[in-house]
Regions:
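Flexible phosphate/Mg2+-sensing switch loops adjacent to catalytic phosphate-binding sites
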Residues: 47-50, 204-208, 331-350, 372-405, ...
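A short, conserved, highly charged catalytic patch centered on acidic carboxylates
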Residues: 1-105, 119-122, 755, 762
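Intrinsic disorder/low-complexity segments
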Residues: 525-551, 847-869
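Signature of N6-adenine DNA methyltransferases within the class I
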Residues: 22, 56-62, 83, 87-89, ...
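Polybasic, glycine- and aromatic-enriched phosphate-binding surface used to engage nucleic acids
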Residues: 78, 95, 614, 622-874
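Glycine- and acidic
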Residues: 13-21, 75-77, 149-152, 168-175, ...
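Preference for the N-terminal adenyl/adenosyl cofactor-binding alpha/beta module
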Residues: 2-16, 129, 133-371, 406, ...
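Short, hydrophobic/amphipathic alpha-helical patches that form generic packing surfaces
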Residues: 34-38, 186-195, 292-296, 422-429, ...
Length: 876
């Protein structure tokens, strides 16, 4: 067990005085370092060796003054010698060491000075021997104290995940797979963290592997089984003749090591892979994202299919802050000067309960718990500042109230659920290390008696009250799977319909919508006292301090499509019916992934509850990658706009007397009826008579970028003429074959008309072409008048029978603002639609020759029309 910091400081002061006058390297260096390790309560003989033989970089034999494998290399010189040269000499030994034995620190000394090089951070610190007691925290890694600051995309997270991935692949290829492999890896993951963060002794697990298992790996599986059994057995119940290296391990409990596993048959290479994983400094690894990285490396395809997107901590904090942490931090500032109120606040935060119903590897729960513990840390500093300043030693076990057992998760995949469970324990321990640093006493919660509740199951098919009764819950959070309505598997769709099947238009919904609806129904159940709901009734007996808010507060990360286009009316119509109010939201931004092939998805965050919470906070972004700026809103509606709640359903007809809008012509041809410039040239050289059947073709890309493209427009072509154009006929035959092989019955029917586009809506008069998708960077979507001879592709919409005034209204800033507000998006690009954008737009009445109004009204209409036409002409 590590010494308290106060004890270490006392020992350091005595050590400095004892060695203040020593000068000769050879005479007393070994005694010096034995004493140095004793300062931190560690026996040098147990962890490090003197005069370690090694091949230097130049091929010559050398001897390392002191080596603690994988941790520390010491080079010692006589007083006054050059420490830069000592460091250079130390690094010259590196080529002769195994990779897993390479040190994380190099310490050089001349008795009077100690210079520590942190090789992973690149930092260097020099301490005078006489001042060692003032800087003992620099050497906390020796005693087992080590607090890390985690960084997004730290390469250490990637390396650690890849090393575990290598071990996973090697074992799976040998036939050890499935549930047993997943449990084994989670246990190994715990052991790796444990020996680098003070749960186990430093290098205890690695030394066991190196010293108590055969080099060829033949007995490694059996030895691990022995170790796992011991970790699940209290010390007093272990066999007295147990191998001392196993008996020395702490009792862990927590069900982590309870299940018996068939021993894996390791090879030499697999043993080396595990030892290589041991060589990482696991104290640097963030449990918040490691599990996600680990899972993605093991099975990237499965991860994509589940729609999971693992995220940076910065983005997770965008949800956690406005959901609960910002409010708790503000409350802490209000009460921190009042000891009684502060104690009550401490009890309040310890009682808060959280659920992530799509928790994956637990990253949202982990960071929520970490932030709550960080707040508790500040509370304890405020409560016990006088005692700490006076050097009084306090027992953190009596002071820490927050624990992982207030955190719940549901995860459909077994392996991520197991990782989430362990990640919560590891985060708890890492926060306990901060308490150690603050109070000077070791704080390790072993055996594990409390744990997060992570349920392996389908959240859309279960009653969440069976996981945690709504009466006990304060917050729901997470990022359910990002799967669009058209990308769902049959199972995804069945799960969605199990929740939303009664809603008209449920087929339009993205998968994430099911979690919104499920959460809204769940929090409503808390209020159903009149129906005899036990969860709701149970609330009556709770102390008001522990009841939290009357309503559970929820927040999900979601694809931005749930706040745009057709989905809004379907999803939010039901959400509003269930009494939900949005109290904070992040508008569209780029949600980055920490895993391989970093995925960026355009997302929103929506916070909602059944009570009307103020102030309402709306976070907007200048671009999807910029930092947000906050707006205090009077109301946040389902389009994430500061305006009254309104819902637009898809309309078949436009409002007002304006032309109908339609989709362009869909070839459904596999590209056989479309021609590039070069293909057109080649065809006309061979068959010049085909020229009368070739038309200019405009898809959205061609229209926006002025790119020439052509199509075969074979309406009314006589069969005899087609036979005289063999190259054209060959293309038509290819269309027929493609359509005949389609899985869609309607497409197979089109095989009877292979010379024609699959869907034809080409007008006979000039029309307005409207690209269906356009970049968000444009202030105006580029519409344009097009001659009827030019074929409009189905990546556009078209408005026939249009005049200049109607074109002017479509290009107006008012119409563009309408599109940006209610239209759908592809990522963050605009999506123009008939049913939502065009047909719901409140077109103004503009008098004209075809609709003359009487008297002054007619004259005013003509003036308006003239102004709009002039503006439209300027655009053209």
């Amino acid at each position: 067990m590590p010494l308290s910091w106060n004890e270490i400081k006392d020992r350091a002061l005595r050590f400095s005085r004892e060695w203040a006058e020593e000068t000769a390297e050879d005479a007393e260096a070994k005694s010096f370092w034995d004493g140095f390790f004793e300062v931190f309560g560690v026996s040098r003989r147990r962890v490090a060796s003197f005069e370690q033989p090694v091949k230097r970089g130049d091929g010559k034999d050398g001897y390392i003054d002191l080596l603690w494998k994988g941790i520390l290399l010491v080079e010692h010189k006589s007083r006054g010698k050059n420490l830069d040269r000592a460091f250079k000499q130390a690094t010259d030994y590196f080529p002769g060491l195994k990779e897993r034995d390479l040190p994380k620190y190099v310490l050089v000394s001349d008795f009077a000075r100690l210079r520590l090089h942190d090789l992973e951070s690149g930092e260097q610190h020099e301490v005078a021997l006489a001042e060692l007691h003032q800087h003992v925290a620099l050497f906390g890694f020796i005693a087992g104290y080590q607090v890390r600051v985690f960084k997004d995309q730290d390469p250490a997270n990637i390396r650690a995940a890849e090393r575990m991935g290598e071990l996973h692949d090697a074992l799976r290829q040998s036939g050890y797979e499935g549930h047993e492999l997943e449990v084994l890896l989670v246990r190994l993951l715990f052991c790796l963290f444990a020996e680098d963060t003070g749960i186990f002794e430093r290098r205890q697990f690695q030394d066991f592997l190196e010293q108590r298992t055969a080099d060829d790996g033949s007995d490694l599986g059996a030895r691990l089984a022995e170790l796992f059994h011991a970790l699940n057995t209290p010390r007093e119940k272990r066999q007295r003749t147990l191998d001392e290296s196993i008996a020395a391990f702490e009792y862990v409990n927590g069900a982590l090591f309870r299940e018996p596993l068939p021993p894996a048959a390791f090879t030499r290479a697999q043993r080396e892979a595990l030892l290589n994983a041991c060589s990482m400094d696991w104290s640097r690894i963030s449990p918040a994202i490691f599990g996600a990285l680990f899972q993605s490396i093991m099975d990237a395809k499965a991860r994509r299919n589940l729609g999971a997107h693992y995220t940076s901590e910065k983005n997770i904090l965008k949800l956690i802050g406005p959901l609960f942490m910002d409010g708790l931090r503000a409350e802490f500032e209000r009460v921190k000067g009042n000891r009684k109120a502060l104690n009550q606040f401490h009890e309040k935060i310890a009682a808060l309960t959280f659920l992530d119903p799509a928790c994956g590897c637990g990253n949202f729960l982990v960071i929520a718990y970490r932030e709550l513990r960080a707040l508790e840390h500040d509370i304890l500093q405020a409560l016990y500042r006088k005692e700490l300043d006076g050097g009084q030693v306090l027992d953190p076990r009596q002071l820490i109230l927050c624990n992982v057992d207030k955190f719940y998760g549901i995860e459909i995949e077994e392996f991520p659920a197991q990782i989430a469970q362990v990640a919560m324990w590891l985060t708890d321990h890492q926060m306990n290390l901060r308490v150690q640093e603050q109070f000077g006493n070791r704080f390790v919660r072993l055996p594990l008696t409390h744990s997060a509740t992570i349920v392996h199951g389908n959240a859309l098919r279960m009653d969440w009250n069976e996981v945690v009764p709504a009466a006990r819950l304060n917050y729901i959070l997470g990022n359910p799977p990002f799967i669009g309505a058209k990308m769902m598997s049959e199972q995804n769709r069945a799960d969605l319909l199990a929740v939303a099947g009664k809603l008209k238009g449920a087929g339009l919904l993205d998968f994430v919508s099911a979690w919104y609806l499920k959460a809204a129904e769940y929090i409503q159940s808390r209020h159903s006292r009149e129906s005899g709901n036990p969860a709701a009734l149970a609330t009556e007996g709770l102390d008001s301090r522990f009841r939290g808010n009357d309503d559970i507060r929820c927040a999900f990360v979601s694809t931005n499509s749930i706040t745009q286009g057709e989905q809004v009316g379907v999803l939010w119509g039901e959400m509003l019916r269930l009494g939900v109010c949005i109290f904070f939201a992040h508008r569209t931004f780029s949600w980055n992934n920490e895993a391989r092939g970093v995925a960026a998805v355009h997302c929103v965050i929506v916070g909602f509850a059944r009570q009307d919470i103020s102030p309402k906070r709306l976070f907007d972004y200048e671009t999807v990658k910029s930092e947000p700026h906050e707006i205090v809103a009077a109301n946040i509606n389902p389009y994430l706009v500061d305006a009254a709640n309104m819902l637009l359903s898809s309309r078949r007809e436009p409002i007002g007397r304006v032309p109908q809008i339609a989709f362009g012509n869909m070839p459904n041809d596999g590209g056989n009826l479309l021609l590039s410039d070069e293909e057109k040239h080649v065809l006309l050289q061979a068959e010049p008579d085909a020229a009368r059947w070739i038309r200019s073709f405009l898809g959205a890309h061609e229209f926006i970028n002025s790119t020439p493209r052509w199509c075969l427009w074979l309406r009314d072509i006589p069969p005899a003429e087609l036979r005289n154009l063999p190259l054209v006929a060959r293309r038509v035959a290819a269309v027929k074959g493609l359509r005949q092989e389609s899985s869609r019955a309607t497409t197979r029917e089109l095989a009877a008309y292979p010379a024609l586009f699959g869907e034809i809506r080409q007008p006979i008069e000039r029309y307005i072409l409207v690209p269906r998708h356009s970049s968000e960077s444009r202030a105006y979507i580029p519409f344009g008048f097009v001659d009827p001879h030019v074929i409009c592709g189905d990546s556009n919409m078209l408005v026939p029978s249009s005049d200049l005034a109607h074109f002017g209204m479509m290009q107006s800033s008012m119409h563009m603002a309408w599109l940006r507000t209610v239209g759908g998006r592809l990522k963050s690009d605009y999506r123009y639609s008939a049913g939502i954008v065009y047909n719901n737009f409140p077109w103004p009445e503009i008098a004209g020759p075809s609709t003359p109004a009487a008297g002054a009204a007619y004259a005013q209409g003509e003036r308006s029309r003239g102004a709009i036409e002039a503006a439209a002409q300027a655009v053209l």
